[in-house]
A protein has these predicted regions:
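Conserved catalytic core of sirtuin-type NAD+-dependent deacylases
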Residues: 1-241
Length: 241
């Protein structure tokens, strides 16, 4: 199966990668929906409640306590999947990474064209004056983080439940998928909409799914591999001419 994947990659000139939480689990970042992910851990409120715009507005101290504890992951490094995708971009084969992750690991690996559908924990801004702050400012603050310049609340640039996706990011992602000759879907269960709905714009030659569990794209895929994506993309395969 990996040999078939490498053959598809070698024949492609416009690859787009669409990824989710499973891409970063090998970097030590938990998958929200896996058996041992955030959705199966015990809190006073379910994560989808805490990570909502309403909760952020009404219970900001609890929101930021959870956010610092569970969403800011210190010391995470790009894994083999991130590094291989960045390499494919440098080689000119991969044109874009579309990610549902908020950890910035694709950019840390060297990827340049990355559409972050759900934003990034690395960017934070004052809701009052617009001043920008890095992740360390949030991590090192206590209680509700406040802007030193104006006193406004500093909000992570992540898409919370009840919030819409960024239109420019969406547009760029759709355009990339429409132009792709190969779409590789990796580390995502394809259950979060509207993000998962973007794959319907693909009209290219090869659809590949690399995910530990079945997805609703499997039936249309040319190739499905049920292995950790870092393992798959790091395997050395020599293709016969």
């Amino acid at each position: 199966m990996v040999e078939k994947l490498e053959r598809i990659i070698s024949q492609s000139q416009n690859i787009v990668f669409f990824g989710g939480a499973g891409v970063s689990t090998e970097s030590g970042i938990p998958d929200f929906r896996s058996v041992d992910g955030l959705y199966h851990q015990k809190y006073d409120y379910p994560p989808e409640t805490i990570l909502s715009h309403t909760f952020w507005e009404e219970r900001p101290e609890e929101f930021y306590r959870f956010y610092r504890d569970k969403l800011i992951v210190k010391g995470a490094k790009p894994n083999a999947a991130h590094l291989r995708l960045a390499k494919l971009e440098r080689e000119g084969r991969l044109k874009a990474v579309i990610t549902q992750n908020i950890d910035g690991l694709h950019q840390a690996a060297g990827s340049k064209t990355v559409y972050e559908l759900h934003g990034s924990t690395l960017r934070n801004y004052c809701v009052k004056c617009g001043a920008v702050y890095d992740v360390d400012f949030i991590a090192n603050s206590t209680g509700v983080p406040r802007c030193p310049k104006c006193g406004g609340i500093i909000k992570p640039d992540v898409v919370l439940y009840e919030e819409g996706l960024d239109e420019q990011v969406l547009s760029g992602a759709v355009s990339a998928i429409r132009r792709a000759d190969t779409l590789i879907i990796g580390g995502t269960s394809l259950v979060v909409y509207p993000a998962a709905g973007l794959i319907r714009y693909f009209r290219g030659d090869h659809l590949v799914v690399i995910n530990m569990q079945p997805t609703n794209a499997d039936a249309e895929a040319d190739l499905c591999i049920a292995k950790p994506i870092g393992q798959v993309l790091s395997e050395d395969v020599v293709l016969d001419d």
